[in-house]
Amino acid sequence: MNKSFIKNKLKQESFVPSKKMGQNFLLSNNIKNKIVDVANINKDDLILEIGPGWGAITEILVQKTNILIAIELDKRLYAHLKTYIKTSNFHIINNDVLCVDLDNLILDYNNTQKIQKIKVVANLPYAISSKIVLKIIQSKLINDAYIMVQKEMAERIGAKVNTRGYNAFTVLVQLFCKTKILFEVNAKEFHPQPKVQSAVIHLENLHNSVNFNIEELGKFLRICFLNKRKKLKNNLSNIYDIKIINQMFIDYNLDMNLRAENIEPKMFLKLFNYLNR
């Protein structure tokens, strides 16, 4: 599948990409091959693709693995892929990924085969990419994700403590997985061209055994980063008793002047547990 194929398909079928779904189709053969290459796929890996679109990456993935599962919301693209890729190792469902239990879906196709690793390989729809990332990192089965997202989001996910991009989302993701930005992708490699640059990142799931409510932790982190210029204890005092906060800082030997951007992810988890015990 090349640029001409996709552009001709768009013309022939009067296909108007959905802004609501964040549809920007990858045209570059070089980039799609590069994404698959960095995923280092073994035949015994189960691959999950989210938002396969016209199948630019799908047609390569299906040659690399014994089990490829794709989730596509757009009924037009779902119908296209049902006829375009007919190999027995390809399975596609027409659904919103945010409504799918990923682990249950994987188990449905993993009851007879010997699986080495479970990997997500995808060009994510940018409008909901943060929500998809949160689903991926909470999976008990997914080992790795090689995903394309907005460059800005990639930088937030991979941000280090004491840097500008470090925020609540950074901390939440890094509590669940190791992160690495692999390479950037220019907007001209898509149709229609997005207004932002993109990047491919690797998430290695830590399969965190720590028992906590991710929604409650997310709320806590947003409070911590509510005003990045304020001291952390001042942000926390909007919700928690200042006396308890001060004692917590003493117990953990923390500087009272620290801001949220100065705190490592694992320490945030300790603070969360301390204040919510």
UniProtKB/Swiss-Prot annotation:
User: Which principal EC class is assigned to this enzyme?
Assistant: transferase
Cellular component GO terms, alphabetically?
A: cytosol
For this protein, the record's Pfam families field holds: RrnaAD (PF00398)
Instruction: Tell me the keywords, alphabetical order.
Output: Cytoplasm, Methyltransferase, RNA-binding, rRNA processing, S-adenosyl-L-methionine, Transferase
Task: Give the molecular function GO annotations.
Answer: 16S rRNA (adenine(1518)-N(6)/adenine(1519)-N(6))-dimethyltransferase activity; RNA binding
**Which InterPro entries does this chain map to?**
KsgA/Erm, rRNA_Ade_diMease-like_C, rRNA_Ade_Mease_Trfase_CS, rRNA_Ade_methylase_Trfase_N, rRNA_adenine_dimethylase, SAM-dependent_MTases_sf
Location within or outside the cell: Cytoplasm
- Disulfide pairs here are none
Q: Which reaction does it catalyse?
A: adenosine(1518)/adenosine(1519) in 16S rRNA + 4 S-adenosyl-L-methionine = N(6)-dimethyladenosine(1518)/N(6)-dimethyladenosine(1519) in 16S rRNA + 4 S-adenosyl-L-homocysteine + 4 H(+)
Q: Where does S-adenosyl-L-methionine bind?
A: 24, 26, 51, 72, 96, 123
Q: What is its EC number?
A: 2.1.1.182
Task: Indicate the transmembrane segments per the record.
Answer: none
Q: Main role? A: Specifically dimethylates two adjacent adenosines (A1518 and A1519) in the loop of a conserved hairpin near the 3'-end of 16S rRNA in the 30S particle. May play a critical role in biogenesis of 30S subunits.
Q: Which family does it belong to?
A: Belongs to the class I-like SAM-binding methyltransferase superfamily. rRNA adenine N(6)-methyltransferase family. RsmA subfamily.
This one is known as Ribosomal RNA small subunit methyltransferase A
The gene name reads rsmA
